[in-house]
Curated annotation (Swiss-Prot):
Record's protein name: 2-aminoethylphosphonate--pyruvate transaminase
Organism: Salmonella paratyphi A (strain AKU_12601)
Family membership noted in the UniProt record: Belongs to the class-V pyridoxal-phosphate-dependent aminotransferase family. PhnW subfamily.
Modified-residue entries (N6-(pyridoxal phosphate)lysine), positions: K194
GO biological process: organic phosphonate catabolic process
């Protein structure tokens, strides 16, 4: 295992490499060409290339967490006459519904429950009876449960019905192969501190340029105006409208180099997938059960039912694991008592093996 205080087994922020951390030791000037052209513009080009080889796409970086970018897209992509169908089966789909409500955006929330895969036929039926829907928005990897949602099938519906398609790929982009043009995605949203394995500080949107250009004057926010941010970066060669998170950006540039060195998204996906499978097999051997069936799991994070033993307390389990150098995630499912373990970031097979040994030691309720 790499040198660290402890291993973050979370869906981001996550454990980063020493070299990603070291990239932040340099101070950059936000108006300097070495930074804007040499770093920011290179990142924008690399992100677009990771998303698709098709022409007509661009990328925008935005200060803040991933939710800032989700709100920027919803607040900029939808005009007063538009309506969005939000497919929700977890906390992050529900957050989009909340955002739309607060911004006064017309929306239809299709909530299929936290442990159910969205029913594509039901989505088809909603689109068929409501022609006022102009946009579809959904989460790809719903980290509430660890479920991977069917963005390909919903994308086919968006294309067939002529709807603008927004995908929150926060914890999947860079870790799961995808071609956003083939998936008919118009806006893909992700964050620096997820599968690219950078650190928190900014999010990004990869968008169909024609769609983004139509957002002029629509934003319901000054700071979260996606069109204005894009035009500033386009017109000023990587310049951010407001203070750029320079150290985070330098870390992200290094993280992109390390993604390429690993073998790209396909190789990283293979590592994540093997991590997750080994984790589930080991946890089941220790007596834990997964919340979801195997075919629903993403290779990003897994939810496990909490032990039914009356002595079990998550806080104590967490403390004992942290003492051994491992940090896991509490549950977020409303109807079940669970905890979650992520396996993305600078996490390898040996780390999963060591984690399982630590979990066995931390199972105080079995002793």
């Amino acid at each position: 295992m790499t040198s660290r205080n402890y291993l973050l087994l979370t869906p981001g922020p996550l454990t980063t490499s020493r070299t990603v951390k070291e990239a932040m030791l340099f101070d950059s000037c936000t108006w300097d060409d070495d930074y804007n052209i040499g770093v920011v513009e290179q990142i924008r080009q690399q992100l677009t290339a990771l998303a698709t080889a098709s022409e007509g796409y661009t990328s925008v970086l935005l200060q803040g967490s991933g939710s800032y970018a989700v709100e920027a897209v919803l607040g900029s992509a939808l005009g007063p006459q538009d309506k969005v169908l939000i497919v929700s089966n977890g906390a992050y789909g529900a957050r989009m519904v909340e955002m739309a409500g607060l911004m006064g955006i017309a929306h239809h929330a299709y909530d299929c429950g936290e442990v159910a895969r969205p029913d594509v036929q039901a989505i088809d039926a909603i689109l068929n009876v409501d022609p006022t829907i102009s946009h579809i928005a959904m989460v790809h990897s719903e980290t509430t449960t660890g479920m991977l949602n069917p963005i390909d099938e919903v994308g086919a519906l968006a294309h067939r019905y002529g709807k603008t398609y927004i995908v929150d790929a926060m914890s999947s982009f860079g870790g799961i192969p995808m071609d956003i043009a083939a998936l008919h995605i118009d806006y893909l949203i992700s964050s620096a501190n997820k599968c690219i394995q950078g650190v928190p500080g900014f999010a990004f949107v990869i968008a169909r340029e024609q769609k983004l250009a139509a957002c002029k004057g629509r934003s319901r926010s000054l700071s979260l105006d996606l069109y204005a941010q894009w035009r500033c970066m386009e017109d000023n060669h990587g310049k951010w409208r407001f203070t750029s998170p320079t150290h985070t950006v330098l870390a992200f540039a290094q993280a992109l180099k390390e993604l390429a060195k690993e073998g790209g998204v396909a190789a990283r996906h293979q590592r994540y997938q093997q991590n997750q499978r080994s984790l589930v097999a080991g946890m089941r051997a220790l007596g834990f059960n997964t919340l979801l069936d195997d075919e629903l799991h993403s290779p990003i994070i897994t939810a496990f039912y909490s032990p039914e033993d009356p002595q079990y307390r998550f806080s104590e389990f967490y403390r004992r694991l942290k003492e051994q150098g491992f940090v896991i995630y509490p549950g977020k499912v409303s109807q079940s008592d669970c905890f979650r373990i992520g396996n993305i970031g600078e996490v390898y097979a040996a780390d999963i093996t060591a984690l399982l040994t630590a979990i066995r030691t931390a199972m105080y309720w079995t002793k």
